[in-house]
């Protein structure tokens, strides 16, 4: 049966809302953990996929209305951040009429924090920008400081630099992985005490708490949504972690940034 579903119900007089389907948490292999899992040794994949694949997958496979690139900020280098931004702009450029596109792509990142105790644990947050044009997004992502950042940037490099020795037939993939690890480690840290929008483009910026993240976003002044993600699951969440601890510091709660909170994703459920 070939049934056509109208986009709008024209008989409805007050048709002010429309249900849209999208994904606010899309990773590419620019995220170090995803790159690692894409290596042939892990499950037979063939190396890293470019950001443009996310656009094609959202449009032709998932048939979404929108998606957001939110790779781990801790895995970014200046070149890959530029690649992601360019891919979003290219995706939107081929989406048809700007007033009624077939797909809308947004840019952002995942602030990937984990604390050892409930008092220092804030979890991951997806940072999503309303616009994607030049001058409407930050020059660089803002990562989370702490242990998980160290794993994504330093420890993976220390452990996995010589994987090609275990699988020499696919050594080119592992050498590319090692090159990316080296590029991450060679990115200098941003100088502290300088407003985010005055820092150079090619440094690595981080924030220890949500409040510090919001203060840096304030420096830019762009429209942005920050969605807490996976706050109660995962190997990195300490026992007894709760919103009660999270909200002890007023700076961590910003209604102008936090109008949404994730309840469920494919990773797990915050209600159980």
Residue ranges and their predicted role:
Residues 1-272:
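Extended, charged catalytic domains and RNA/DNA-binding interfaces, predominantly
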């Amino acid at each position: 049966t070939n049934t056509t579903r109208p986009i709008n119900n024209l008989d409805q007089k007050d048709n002010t809302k429309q249900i849209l389907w999208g994904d606010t948490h899309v990773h590419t292999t620019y995220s170090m953990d995803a790159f690692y899992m894409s290596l042939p040794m892990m499950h037979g994949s063939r190396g890293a996929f470019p950001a443009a694949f996310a656009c094609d997958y959202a449009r032709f496979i998932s048939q979404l209305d929108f998606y957001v690139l939110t790779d781990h900020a801790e895995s970014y280098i200046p070149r890959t951040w530029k690649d992601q931004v360019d891919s979003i702009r290219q995706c939107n450029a081929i989406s048809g009429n700007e007033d009624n596109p077939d797909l809308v792509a947004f840019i952002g990142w995942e602030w990937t924090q984990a604390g050892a105790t409930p008092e220092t644990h804030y979890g991951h947050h997806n940072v999503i920008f309303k616009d994607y044009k030049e001058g409407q997004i930050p020059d660089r992502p803002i990562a989370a400081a702490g242990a998980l950042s160290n794993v994504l940037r330093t420890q993976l490099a220390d452990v996995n630099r010589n994987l090609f020795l275990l699988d020499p037939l696919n050594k080119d993939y592992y050498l590319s992985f090692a090159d990316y690890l080296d590029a991450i480690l060679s990115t200098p840290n941003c100088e502290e005490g300088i407003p985010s929008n005055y820092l150079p483009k090619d440094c690595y910026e981080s924030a220890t708490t949500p409040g510090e993240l919001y203060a840096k976003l304030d420096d830019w002044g762009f429209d942005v949504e920050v969605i807490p993600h996976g706050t109660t699951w995962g190997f990195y969440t300490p026992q007894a972690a709760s919103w009660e601890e999270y909200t002890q510091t007023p700076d961590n709660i910003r209604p102008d940034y936090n109008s949404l909170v994730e309840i469920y994703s494919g990773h797990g459920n915050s209600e159980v």
